[in-house]
Amino acid sequence: MGNGGSSSIASHVSVDFAKVAKVNCSTFNNANLITCFANDYKYENWVVEAIKAYSSKKDLFILISSSGTSKNIVNAAQYCKKNNIDLITLSGFKKNNPLSQSG
């Protein structure tokens, strides 16, 4: 899961996981979902609320942010960490950023 280009990467990776590794996976990149949750919970919280609504403790979340500072992605990483939900974070621009410190 990510924003902008990171969302596109997440979407492509999820297809590869399903096609090659036969792993059931999905992304929360549906415009209706994003706009509904962002409207109801604020943009910085929509990913956390989507995780609460659609996930189980068996899920693994991959959160991507080039900068590592996207508030909605960082909040989701912190929520996963706090609730013992398996998590992988990917970020790139700076080594020490809030996202890399969460995952």
Residue ranges of model-derived segments:
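Glycine-rich phosphate-binding loops that contact phosphosugars or nucleotide phosphates
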Residues: 3-103
